[in-house]
């Protein structure tokens, strides 16, 4: 039997997609637009798979930028895979891991595209290729990131009214500590028991600030504190995890499956944020999830603010998890005002609903893609 081969891999920068609320303020970066990298894998049987590699703020968050992702795929990763069997994803990803250190965002996009193609070929959704889904929808949190307390409260109340979100994450850390704490506590008091409120500090506190802040936040009903201090301060993370009244979630601390094992062994976090881009793909992120489950660590489905393609690739992986205690934040497509697929993800009743159509369940809108593409 003749194998189906990878014929071509193309990386396309989808440049400056507008967002619904410029600015979107994070501790390390303020977003006005979002730039995606679309990956198209064409196979010898005529099937095309699509994937996405997206970063936050160029190089502000991680080690890869859109331009770097495209350059490395074009020059190194794609040539290594052309001519290989398209249906042997293990062999393809093993070759990439031997060829290139890191580059997890680029690898994740390629793996997602290979899974999409294989799902289309077999008539199965990607979740079935990953072992089978145990749920059909995912709770999705919304990030409040305007920096304005009254505006954030109004936005949260609107989301509750339309049954879009009932979990809210506040991006803090860039302002003085007292100002951030006042902002968060005011929002929680206004929303009360109608919503879960969480914070993401993106490593911006030192340990002395975090000791005080975690106590205040926990005492005021904040449900979760994400990455309060630097990922390199492992002993500080352990101490905070032991004394904080609110659970601590590791995000930036997990840049590989090996990081997840080390964090679990040290007892440095109560919750792991799962991100396919930082682990190297949907299959790799499931290895991190298995480490967490073995260690009794709760799980949360994170985002790199991907568009619809990256969001659905994450969603298909998260559907297969036995526990996803803290839900997800797969709201990336809702942040964008432009779409490059024909089937935008469906959000209703506080959930993202994932269809059972083959592959990721998406097709490209070629006309819209052409408006924003930069090859």
From Swiss-Prot:
Keyword Metal-binding: yes
Gene3D superfamilies (UniProt xref): Enolase-like C-terminal domain, Enolase-like, N-terminal domain
KW Transcription (keyword) present: no
Cofactors (names): Mn(2+)
Pfam families: MR_MLE_C (PF13378), MR_MLE_N (PF02746)
SUPFAM superfamilies registered for this protein in UniProt: Enolase C-terminal domain-like, Enolase N-terminal domain-like
Subunit structure: Homooctamer.
GO biological process: amino acid catabolic process; beta-ketoadipate pathway
Alphabetically ordered keywords of this record: Aromatic hydrocarbons catabolism, Isomerase, Manganese, Metal-binding
Its EC number(s): 5.5.1.1
Lineage: superkingdom: Bacteria
InterPro entries, sorted: Chloromuconate_cycloisomerase, Enolase-like_C_sf, Enolase-like_N, Enolase_C-like, Mandel_Rmase/mucon_lact_enz_CS, Mandelate_racemase_C, Mandelate_racemase_N_dom
Pathway listed: Aromatic compound metabolism; beta-ketoadipate pathway; 5-oxo-4,5-dihydro-2-furylacetate from catechol: step 2/3
Name of the protein in question: Muconate cycloisomerase 1
């Amino acid at each position: 039997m003749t194998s189906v081969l990878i014929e071509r891999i193309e990386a396309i920068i989808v440049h400056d997609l507008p967002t619904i609320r410029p600015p979107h303020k994070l501790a390390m970066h303020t977003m006005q637009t979002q730039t995606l990298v679309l990956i198209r894998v064409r196979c010898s049987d005529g099937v095309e798979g699509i994937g996405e590699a997206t970063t936050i703020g160029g190089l502000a968050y991680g080690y890869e930028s859109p331009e770097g992702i495209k350059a490395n795929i074009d020059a190194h990763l794609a040539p290594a895979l052309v001519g290989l069997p398209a249906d042997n994803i293990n062999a393809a990803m093993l070759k990439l891991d031997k060829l290139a250190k890191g580059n997890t965002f680029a690898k994740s996009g390629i793996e997602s595209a290979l899974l999409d193609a294989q799902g289309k070929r077999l008539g199965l959704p990607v979740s079935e290729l990953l072992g089978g889904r145990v749920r059909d929808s995912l709770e999705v949190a919304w990030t409040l990131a305007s920096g304005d307390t009254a505006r954030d409260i109004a936005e949260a109340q609107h989301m509750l009214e339309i049954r879009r979100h009932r979990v809210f994450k506040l991006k803090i850390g860039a302002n003085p500590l007292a100002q951030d704490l006042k902002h968060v506590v005011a929002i929680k008091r206004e929303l009360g028991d109608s919503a879960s409120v969480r914070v993401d500090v993106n490593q911006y506190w030192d340990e002395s600030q975090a000791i005080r802040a975690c106590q205040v936040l926990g005492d005021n009903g904040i449900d979760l504190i994400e990455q309060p201090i630097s990922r390199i301060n492992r002993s500080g993370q352990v101490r905070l995890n032991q004394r904080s009244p609110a659970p601590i979630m590791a995000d930036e601390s997990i840049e590989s499956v090996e990081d997840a094992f080390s964090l679990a062994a040290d007892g440095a976090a109560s919750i792991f944020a799962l991100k396919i881009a930082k682990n190297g793909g949907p299959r790799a992120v499931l290895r991190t999830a298995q480490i967490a489950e073995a260690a009794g660590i709760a799980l949360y489905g994170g985002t790199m603010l991907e568009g619809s393609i990256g969001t659905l690739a994450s969603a298909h992986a998260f559907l297969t998890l036995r526990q996803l205690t803290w839900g997800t934040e797969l709201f990336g497509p809702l942040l964008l005002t432009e779409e490059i697929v024909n089937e935008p993800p469906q959000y209703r009743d506080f959930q993202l609903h994932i269809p059972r159509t083959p592959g990721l369940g998406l097709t490209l809108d070629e006309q819209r893609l052409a408006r924003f593409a930069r090859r």
